[in-house]
Amino acid sequence: MSEISVTQTLDTLGLRCPEPVMLVRKNIRHLNDGEILLIIADDPATTRDIPSFCQFMDHTLLQSEVEKPPFKYWVKRGK
């Protein structure tokens, strides 16, 4: 995938469920549609929770790196 232009980065390293998703929800609210939030996490639950959050809240998971921590997720606000 080509370079993704990140609007904001959210570091949730050391936080455990449900804190990472709660912070994602809080931070993505401040972005405009089409802007991108990069989430960095080490909680294994985020590999399930972030994609589910995107689907439920109608955001787009552009890319993820979940082979080993730290995990990274590029989420675009909106579809």
UniProtKB/Swiss-Prot annotation:
Subcellular locations according to the entry: Cytoplasm
GO cellular component terms listed in the entry, alphabetical order: cytoplasm
GO MF annotation list: sulfur carrier activity
Top-rank taxon: Bacteria
Active site, per annotation: C17 (cysteine persulfide intermediate)
Cross-referenced Pfam families: TusA
UniProt keyword annotations, A-Z: Cytoplasm
Xref: InterPro entries: Sulphur_carrier_TusA, TusA-like, TusA-like_sf
Protein task: Sulfur carrier protein which probably makes part of a sulfur-relay system.
Entry's family note: Belongs to the sulfur carrier protein TusA family.
PANTHER family: SULFUR CARRIER PROTEIN TUSA (PTHR33279:SF2), SULFUR CARRIER PROTEIN YEDF-RELATED (PTHR33279)
The name this protein goes by in its record: Sulfur carrier protein TusA
Organism annotation: Haemophilus influenzae (strain PittEE)
Top-level taxonomy: Bacteria, Pseudomonadati, Pseudomonadota, Gammaproteobacteria, Pasteurellales
Gene transcribed to yield this protein: tusA
